[in-house]
């Protein structure tokens, strides 16, 4: 009898959810009968010996990407209130908490995707079924000092101006002890497949042409500058 490896990991208690199981597989950390599993949907023997080479530091690989950005740009989130747009499983949120964020407002258009350990954490305010295109006055507290964004199936150029306006019209502070906010740091994960034209995206949603990727990033930078953001730089995630 064969089983999907992601299902098997959950059934055996090696992963708390299929999202977590898939992240472990994609990180190359799952072995079935001492052979590395390449795909989350890979079929393996139901009785296979399955082991994990090492635990991921965050609930998804996205956390490692944000960690890299924080280090690269020298951004400290300790003691700050943050907003995670497109939170999904919670990789970014997990990274923020592990780096000392005081509170995280986690927005996602879906429902119930966030890992339970984060959903049940009192420092996390879950805003499910929230399309961030509709961010408005009062949706963000006045003490938000950091925003991260990991969105799919929409261009971030549609969100950056909306986010800027929401920050300008933010509500009252959520934490009395949070540091006074003068500058808000924003980290955006740019996905070229959602920024490029339809004819520029290949099979599987992959943009292989370096020129298209550069142009997509440039469009995001131009949008950010036009919306009043100060663009510090970029990096490969």
Indicate where each model-derived feature is located.
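S-adenosyl-L-methionine
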Residues: 105-154, 158
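A basic, amphipathic helix-loop patch mediating RNA/tRNA/ribosome contacts
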Residues: 1-46
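Conserved class I S-adenosyl-L-methionine
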Residues: 78-88
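Short alpha-helix
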Residues: 213-227
């Amino acid at each position: 009898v064969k089983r999907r490896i992601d299902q098997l990991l959950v059934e055996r208690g090696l992963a708390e959810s299929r999202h977590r199981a898939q992240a472990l597989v994609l990180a190359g950390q799952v072995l079935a009968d001492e052979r590395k599993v390449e795909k989350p949907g890979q079929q393996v023997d139901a009785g296979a010996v399955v082991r994990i080479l090492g635990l991921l530091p965050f609930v998804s690989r996205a956390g490692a990407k944000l960690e890299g950005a924080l280090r690269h740009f020298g951004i400290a989130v300790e003691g700050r209130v943050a907003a995670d747009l497109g939170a999904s499983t919670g990789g970014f949120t997990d990274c923020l908490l592990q780096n000392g964020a005081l509170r995280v407002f986690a927005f996602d258009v879906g429902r119930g995707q966030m890992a339970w350990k984060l959903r049940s954490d009192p420092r996390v305010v879950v805003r499910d079924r929230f399309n961030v295109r509709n961010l408005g006055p009062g949706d963000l507290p006045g003490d938000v000092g950091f925003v991260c964004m990991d969105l799919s199936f929409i261009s971030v150029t549609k969100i950056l101006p909306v986010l800027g306006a929401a920050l300008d019209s933010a509500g009252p502070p959520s934490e009395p002890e949070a540091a006074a906010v003068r500058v808000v740091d924003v980290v955006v994960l740019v996905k070229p497949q959602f920024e490029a034209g339809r004819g520029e995206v290949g099979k599987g949603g992959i943009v292989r042409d370096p020129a298209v990727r550069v142009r997509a990033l440039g469009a995001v930078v131009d949008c950010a500058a036009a919306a009043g953001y100060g663009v510090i730089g970029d990096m490969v995630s």
